[in-house]
UniProtKB/Swiss-Prot annotation:
NCBIfam families: tsf (TIGR00116)
InterPro entries referenced in this protein's UniProt entry, alphabetically: EF-Ts_dimer_sf (IPR036402), Transl_elong_EFTs/EF1B (IPR001816), Transl_elong_EFTs/EF1B_dimer (IPR014039), Transl_elong_Ts_CS (IPR018101), UBA-like_sf (IPR009060)
GO molecular function: translation elongation factor activity
Functional summary from the UniProt entry: Associates with the EF-Tu.GDP complex and induces the exchange of GDP to GTP. It remains bound to the aminoacyl-tRNA.EF-Tu.GTP complex up to the GTP hydrolysis stage on the ribosome.
UniProt keyword Cytoplasm, yes or no: yes
Protein name in UniProt: Elongation factor Ts
Region span, Involved in Mg(2+) ion dislocation from EF-Tu: 80-83
Predominant location category: cytoplasm
Keywords noted in UniProt: Cytoplasm, Elongation factor, Protein biosynthesis
Gene that this polypeptide is encoded by: tsf
Species annotation: Aeromonas hydrophila subsp. hydrophila (strain ATCC 7966 / DSM 30187 / BCRC 13018 / CCUG 14551 / JCM 1027 / KCTC 2358 / NCIMB 9240 / NCTC 8049)
CDD domains the UniProt entry points to: UBA_EF-Ts (cd14275)
Length: 293
């Protein structure tokens, strides 16, 4: 029998999200060959999908698609980066975003209830893949935008953007979608920054100035200039254009005779609290449980 190291068990666990004892057993059966162990584990993934539903799905892929004057983006989650690259998972995501675009579905529940094209609903198709692969998955959100000048951009499968322009071109819309993906603006224009956000930032900047030794009156005057810079930094039109930093996005739009109506940016797992596990503590807990059995 091959000598299975703890490091090898840990690597297999990280790549498959399977339990420590399951990983050790799989490696023993594969004589220490981790790739063979992964293949065997995937083939034997017969666990019921219901057992996976409570696990946190914070990895995944953003899928985007344009159909005529409709642009759609979805976030499909899974538990591990390993599964986010699985061919079956990717094919399913592409089909789901196609369904959303062609049928103009903008609601997650409605999309889950839609026919996948195999006589089963989208939700049931996801459930079947959960049972086959052996980890939780979730269709988390969908965004649909209609308009004439739409741009979509997906960066590294993890960040997706839809932009909608008045005027301009689809190419400009795509360039701006790329910019939003890279620079994460929170608002379209500086004047769109909410009073609440401005007030909070002003308070922070005044405290910083006072703590540096400035009198309150001088600190407040200093902050006015900083606030203008702040609203520009957090708004799309106030930022230097990613493909030509010598001009702002506002200057680019003026040159192209266009305006930004809206943008939506998805990033995989944002807002989902990932569960962090102490590997050594988990090993100790599982050994203790095994000794009690």
């Amino acid at each position: 029998m091959a000598n299975i190291s703890a490091a090898l068990v840990k690597e297999l666990r990280e790549r498959t999200a399977a339990g420590m004892m399951d990983c050790k057993k799989a490696l023993e059966e594969a004589a220490g060959d981790i790739e063979l162990a992964i293949e065997n584990m995937r083939k034997s993934g017969q666990a019921k999908a219901a057992k996976k539903a409570g696990r946190i799905a914070a990895e995944g892929v953003i899928f985007a698609r344009t159909e005529g004057n409709v642009a759609v983006m979805i976030e499909l989650n899974c538990e591990t980066d390993f599964v986010s690259k699985d061919a079956g998972f990717l094919a399913m995501g592409q089909k789901i975003v196609e369904i959303a675009a062609t049928q103009k579905i903008a609601d997650v529940d409605a999309l889950k209830a839609a026919d996948f094209g195999n006589g089963e609903s989208v939700e049931l198709t996801i459930t079947n893949l959960i049972a086959k692969i052996g980890e939780n998955m979730n269709l988390r959100r969908v965004m649909l935008v209609e308009g004439d000048n739409l741009g979509t951009y997906v960066h590294g499968s993890r960040i997706g953007v839809i932009t909608k322009l008045a005027g301009g071109s689809d190419e400009l819309a795509k360039d701006l979608a790329m910019h939003v993906a890279a620079n994460s603006p929170q608002f379209v224009k500086p004047e769109d920054v909410s009073a609440e956000v401005v007030a909070k930032e002003r308070e922070i900047q005044i405290d910083i100035a006072i703590n540096s030794g400035k009198p309150k009156e001088i600190a407040e005057k200093m902050v006015e200039g900083r606030m203008k810079k702040f609203t520009g930094e957090v708004s799309l039109t106030g930022q230097p254009f990613v493909k030509d930093p010598s001009m702002t996005v506002a200057e680019l739009l003026k040159k192209e005779g266009a305006d930004v109506v809206s943008f939506t940016r998805f990033e995989v797992g944002e807002g989902i609290e990932k569960q962090e596990t102490d590997f050594a503590a988990e090993v100790a807990a599982q050994i203790a449980a095994a000794q009690k059995a």
